[in-house]
Amino acid sequence: QTNFSTLEAFFVGSAPLYDALRAFAAQRPLRMHMPGHKGKPLPAPELAAIAAIDFTELPPTGDLFSGGGAIGAAEALWAEVFHMDSCLFLTGGSTQGVHAALALACKPGETVLLDRGSHRSAYNALALLDLKPVYLERPWLASEGITGPISPSAVAQALEEYPDAKTLCITSPTYYGMLSDLPALAELMHRRGGVLVVDGAHAAHLPSLGNDHLSAA
């Protein structure tokens, strides 16, 4: 009998995808699919419950590419938490999200204002989409030993120098937790008919801390 108490501590209220995985695991199905551990307990006791509900895409568990079902319910719940109109879970990690966002925001050959501290996925997107970068350097904060935020004034200056740039792509928060003023940056870009693209791979916790106004969502 699998002990799910360690997992349930993470869930408060509705958890449609977790509930669907638990319900399917309770049927004790014959696992003729990935992953190779077949739901058997892993060496670390704290991972036993995770292995029990570790399924691939199946009719009872849902498919990230088609939506609906438990995955669709989970996406709707996530959108509600982040105050978004809708949500789509990525099928290939945050790198895929950066690629998709820039592909939607830009046309080949366009100029992009790019945070110099961006993840390599943004640089890969430049090559894949034939985009021209204008790099924004972050200020060095000597007392903290890290770089600071991308400031609205720096972006405004870059827009004056490169008026054809219609997309700003930054990371917020950074790996070190540095947040940029997203509302101000978004207003600045929207006022010029532009788009703000944010790599928020490290921002999922912000709404739970009451800082959802600093989240890209």
Task: Say what each PLM segment does.
Residues Q1-G69:
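N-terminal "arm"/small-domain region of PLP-dependent enzymes with the aminotransferase-like
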Residues F4-L7, F11-R22, A26, S66, ...:
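Conserved PLP-enzyme active-site core in the AAT-like
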Residues K38-A44, S86-F89, I150, A154:
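Short acidic/polar alpha-helix capping motifs at helix-coil junctions
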Residues L47-Q96, G117:
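Conserved N-terminal alpha-helix of the aminotransferase class I/II PLP-enzyme fold
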